A protein has these predicted regions:
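Acidic, polar-rich low-complexity tracts and alpha-helical solenoid repeat scaffolds
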Residues: 1-246
Length: 246
């Protein structure tokens, strides 16, 4: 993983993983290695190698969390390459997955696709391309693609998700003040959006850890707990709020 995503030595990482797969490993460990291998192939834009490996993990670990994760990543891959109906059919099944985080991620991506598919397919194609650039850590290209939606396909449907992706890039680039302002635009301007609780949680963590604004972070945690009671982040927010309060 370090070789592929940090040191940009994909081929060496692939060789190491393929060598490891020849060892006498448990079914779970083989599945984990195949997942890493698929992630690298996707990073390299070898999407058919990636989808084959994700499908193998899904099939061999169907009822396990790693199987659900592989199915989600395969749906995400299809979204990246513009096969939206295929992705949506898988995501709609995954929304009832045992893992709350997988179910939540599936719900979010499902809504991004379904809302934009109905409203503006060109904006959706651009969002998908930007997301793929983000996966590949090509942040400058991703930002340009997101900005192009604002210029050529401005719409309120895609805006909360677009802002969240720009906030993620700012966060990754350690531009925490920009990330903070973008998260705020989501939960203040689009409070009814399915992204609002996610924006609150991410902003609270950022305010606490990187901007040293503990009081403001507590306000975000409290708002999330009070106003988004069904959020997957409520328990985490409650624990963080108590820790800061005490």
């Amino acid at each position: 993983e370090i070789l592929a995503f940090k040191l940009d030595d994909n081929e060496k990482a692939i060789t190491l993983l393929n060598d490891a797969l020849t060892l006498n490993l448990s079914k779970l460990n083989k599945a984990k290695l195949k997942m890493k291998l698929a992630d690298i192939y996707l990073f390299k834009e070898e999407v058919w190698e990636a989808t084959l490996l994700y499908s193998q993990v899904d099939k061999s670990m169907k009822e396990e969390p790693i199987g659900h994760e592989a199915r989600f990543k395969n749906a995400q891959l299809r979204y990246y390459i513009g096969e939206f109906d295929w992705a949506l059919s898988v995501l709609n099944i995954l929304k009832s997955a045992t893992s709350k985080l997988i179910a939540n991620d599936a719900m979010t991506l499902s809504l991004v696709i379904s809302d934009n598919l109905e409203y503006d397919t060109i904006a959706l194609q651009r969002l998908a391309k930007a997301d793929y650039y983000i996966y590949q850590k090509k942040y400058e290209l991703a930002n340009k693609m997101l900005d192009s939606i604002n210029i050529y396909n401005p719409n309120e449907v895609s805006m909360p998700y677009l802002l969240m992706r720009k906030a993620y890039i700012a966060d990754e680039n350690q531009d925490y003040n920009l990330a903070d302002s973008l998260y705020k635009r989501v939960y203040q301007g689009y409070a009814d959006s399915y992204m609002a609780d996610d924006a609150l949680m991410k902003d609270a963590v950022l305010l606490e850890r990187f901007l040293d604004k503990k009081e403001e972070a507590m306000e975000c945690y409290a708002k999330l707990i009070d106003e988004y009671t069904a959020s997957v982040y409520v328990a985490q927010a409650r624990n963080a709020y108590r820790r800061l309060r005490d």
